[in-house]
Amino acid sequence: MSQTKTKSKPADPAKRARTVIWILLGAIVAAGAIWYAVFTLNKPEPVAVQPVADAQLVREDSHRVTTPAVEKGQLVEFLDFECEACKAAEPVVAELKAEFGDRITFINRYFPLPSHRNSAQAALAVEAAAQQGKYEQMYAKMFETQSQWGEKQDSQAPLFRTFAQELGLDLAAYDAAVASEATKDRIRKDIADGKALGVTGTPTFFLNGEKLTLNSMEEFRQKLADAAQ
């Protein structure tokens, strides 16, 4: 006697995609707990994590990407160039920057996560470009090309060097900056501040010193609008 097989109902693709996204974001945040040890693994004398009292949300050399004539507030973002969530947030941040950049100072700080093999190297490349006045150009290049180099397990430093060449940088100066302990310490300082301030994943935003927990772009925009008054 034959038996009739009951066909299972196909999974909802949208629901499955949402589940994958939340799992991915959860993994990104969880990975932040071990960032410091991995990033300083190859440094003979690791930089000690600063106590909270010494942490600074904004330093003199922090990258200010807007410079309002009259500042109403500061939005600080700790980011990782290999982080998919950071890339997804970038168009939102760009839109808010265009809307509020004349009143809010937008500030970027490095926070490469250890789960991303090339995020620290990407930060070095961006900082090296910044030393030649091309911070924003290299910043944009990293996110534009993330799908090309993100999640690779081999070093992408040669690719990043081609980006420097495309941007017209002095390659000798770029190479020296990437290899410089001063450049590496510049990034480690951002990481140490972030950890001391409670950053465990990316992107993490602080508005006027307050760490934000955001549920929607509308909420994000409203917080900036309130600060910009």
Predicted regions located by residue number:
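Extracytoplasmic thiol/disulfide redox context detector
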Residues: 2-114, 188-191, 226-229
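Cysteine-centric redox/oxidoreductase cores and disulfide-bonded domains
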Residues: 113-202, 206-229
